[in-house]
Amino acid sequence: MTELHQIVKRMLVTEKSTLEKDEKNKYYFEVDRRANKIEIRKAVERLLKVTVDDVHVINIKGKKKRTGRIIGKRRDWKKAVVTLAQGNTIDIYHGV
């Protein structure tokens, strides 16, 4: 994986992630399913110009969804919880 924007797809902003950001300096990202912790760490450090302390990865199975008699499935995806070094922050509301 060479493209940094292919590894880190988007930042996840939820109620839980906002609390973790304020209390523990943790940020949540949706990442490529093939990416490993080392690639995620390097991508976040280069894209956002911060120092990463720790990376936790969670594989999330897609839910089964039903419309009438047709049963479908949402895609599987990977979530990364990135802990930044003390003193580093990411301004997620910049320009809003």
UniProtKB/Swiss-Prot annotation:
It comes from the Bacteria. NCBIfam families: PRK05738.1-3 (NF004359), PRK05738.2-4 (NF004363), PRK05738.3-2 (NF004366). It comes from Syntrophus aciditrophicus (strain SB). It holds the Pfam family Ribosomal_L23. InterPro entries: Nucleotide-bd_a/b_plait_sf (IPR012677), Ribosomal_uL23-like (IPR013025), Ribosomal_uL23/eL15/eS24_sf (IPR012678). This is Large ribosomal subunit protein uL23. GO terms for molecular function: rRNA binding; structural constituent of ribosome. The keyword Zinc does not apply. One of its GO terms (cellular component) is ribosome. The lineage of its organism: Bacteria, Pseudomonadati, Thermodesulfobacteriota, Syntrophia, Syntrophales. Part of the 50S ribosomal subunit. Contacts protein L29, and trigger factor when it is bound to the ribosome. One of the early assembly proteins it binds 23S rRNA. One of the proteins that surrounds the polypeptide exit tunnel on the outside of the ribosome. Forms the main docking site for trigger factor binding to the ribosome. Belongs to the universal ribosomal protein uL23 family.
